């Protein structure tokens, strides 16, 4: 497995379970060894480094992933980078199958005039900063008093919320490191505009994200009443999908809250004075980042109309907003893997009709035996963490089917000495961090957090992680 995030860990667990259940029938036996390679010094990928720190459900997911890794048939190799420390040829010589679960770590480019101005930031880089990504920035410019966030999904909501958060409140409830706490303490943002191209019924927010937006201390929510004038067809269409219906209902609840905040004299959700304003603009498509002296000075937005079918129509009506920083959360681009064809159009590793079998070309091409992809590496950056489970089951089913055929035709000759990979890494001077090493890092984070009355306090420097893990 390449990648120890949710996709890689879920796939490992499901593979072992399905093998135990079906292995004898398929002629494969019921036992396997899974080696899980991760380029970072610690596991969990998106769960640790891609989700806002104030999501309480995330620690439960991390706990479940950790239980899976605490399995004698799964061997964790953190701090080992595919393409640098080990190659595809190295792995194919030692394993019956290789599964890529490499996720997505880069921002999709913002293709707007002015996107290269100083003060335009991709959400992925900002998330890296506040989540303490090992190779991410340690400081972040937060001097802008007026800020714009572009995007209609959960990542945009995360970014906007963190920009409006109170530093002390965030520290008390999360594992943020000192540098992030100090950065947010100095945050000058007073006004934030969230721009969503389509309408209320087409947004992609989870209900949980919306409820977290509602309860920001010291923040007044401001919403345009006109955005909530939905026609009968749109209401009917939204009602067909349970999650969409729940989201729209929650947005109407937020609209009522915003009205109350305004009527009560610019207060937050608890009726306390609000010193920050959070504007939510639906049917608003940014068309240009405005600049002055090479820096962001504003953003131009075109009003749109969205039909019941979700199609957006531009109106030709524009409005400029004065802002000094723009964050774009318009999607991620999954990581490329050396030696594997990348599908630029689909933004994922090339695989056969989405079944996870790696192919030689993005469109069609031949299936490359023993190579697979799962999660965002397979389908592109869509779906929540839970979506990777259904992905994993499909990929594992295909893997077992292919392995069974390989047994019938004479199994591929590979080096199955379990210590072979250890010797190779040692020869190259690579010192992997195993599960026991991760537990040492985790224990230190818990002890440091306890000193401040917190459950965890995240270690951010990779050298410190290595020192702790190898002690």
Locations of the language-model features?
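Glycine-rich Rossmann-fold phosphate-binding loop(s) that bind the pyrophosphate
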Residues: 3-5, 152-153
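N-terminal Rossmann-like dinucleotide/flavin-binding domain of flavoprotein oxidoreductases
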Residues: 26, 31-33, 40-97, 254-272
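Short hydrophobic core segments
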Residues: 94-103, 148-150, 321-331
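Glycine-rich dinucleotide-binding loop and its adjacent helix/turn
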Residues: 107-186, 349-362
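FAD-site-proximal beta/loop scaffold in flavoenzymes
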Residues: 119-137, 289, 295, 307-379
């Amino acid at each position: 497995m390449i990648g120890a995030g949710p996709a890689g860990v879920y796939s490992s667990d499901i593979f072992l379970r399905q093998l135990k259940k079906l292995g004898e029938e398929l002629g494969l036996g019921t036992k396997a060894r899974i080696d899980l390679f991760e380029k970072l010094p610690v596991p969990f990928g998106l769960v640790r480094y891609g989700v806002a720190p104030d999501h309480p459900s995330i620690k439960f997911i991390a706990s479940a992933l950790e239980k899976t890794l605490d399995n004698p048939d799964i061997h964790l190799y953190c701090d080992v980078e595919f393409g640098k420390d080990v190659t595809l040829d190295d792995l194919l010589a030692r394993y019956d199958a290789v599964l890529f679960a490499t996720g997505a770590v880069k921002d999709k480019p913002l293709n707007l005039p002015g996107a290269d101005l100083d003060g335009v930031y991709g959400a992925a880089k900002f998330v890296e900063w506040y989540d303490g990504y090992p190779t991410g920035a340690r400081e972040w410019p937060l001097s802008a008093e007026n800020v714009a966030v572009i995007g209609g999904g959960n990542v945009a909501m995360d970014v906007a919320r963190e920009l409006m958060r109170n530093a002390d409140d965030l520290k008390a409830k999360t594992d943020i490191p000192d540098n992030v706490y100090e950065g947010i303490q100095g945050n000058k943002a007073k006004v934030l505009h969230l721009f969503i191209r389509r309408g209320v019924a087409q947004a992609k927010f989870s209900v949980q994200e919306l409820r977290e937006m509602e309860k920001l201390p010291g923040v007044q929510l401001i919403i345009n009443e006109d955005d909530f004038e939905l026609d009968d067809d749109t209401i009917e269409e939204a009602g067909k999908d349970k999650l969409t219906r729940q989201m729209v209902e929650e947005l109407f609840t937020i609209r009522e809250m915003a009205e109350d905040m305004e009527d009560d004299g610019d207060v937050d959700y608890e009726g306390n004075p609000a010193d920050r304003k959070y504007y939510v603009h639906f049917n608003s498509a940014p068309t240009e980042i405005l600049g002055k002296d090479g820096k962001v000075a504003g953003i131009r937005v075109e009003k749109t109309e969205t039909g019941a079918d979700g199609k957006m129509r531009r109106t030709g009506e524009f409005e400029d907003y004065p802002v000094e920083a723009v964050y774009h959360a318009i999607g991620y681009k999954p990581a490329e893997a050396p030696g594997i064809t990348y599908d630029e159009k689909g933004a994922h590793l090339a695989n056969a009709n989405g079944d996870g079998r790696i192919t030689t070309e993005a469109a069609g091409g031949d299936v490359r035996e023993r190579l697979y992809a799962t999660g965002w590496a397979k389908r592109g950056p869509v779906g929540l963490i839970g979506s990777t489970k259904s992905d994993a089951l499909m990929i594992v089913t295909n893997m077992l089917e292919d392995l069974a055929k390989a047994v019938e035709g004479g199994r591929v000759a590979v080096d199955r000495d379990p210590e072979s990979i250890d010797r190779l890494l040692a020869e190259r001077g690579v010192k992997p961090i195993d599960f026991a090493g991760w537990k040492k890092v985790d224990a230190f984070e818990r002890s440091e957090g306890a000193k401040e009355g917190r459950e965890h306090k995240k270690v951010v420097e990779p050298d410190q992680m290595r020192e702790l893990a190898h002690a």
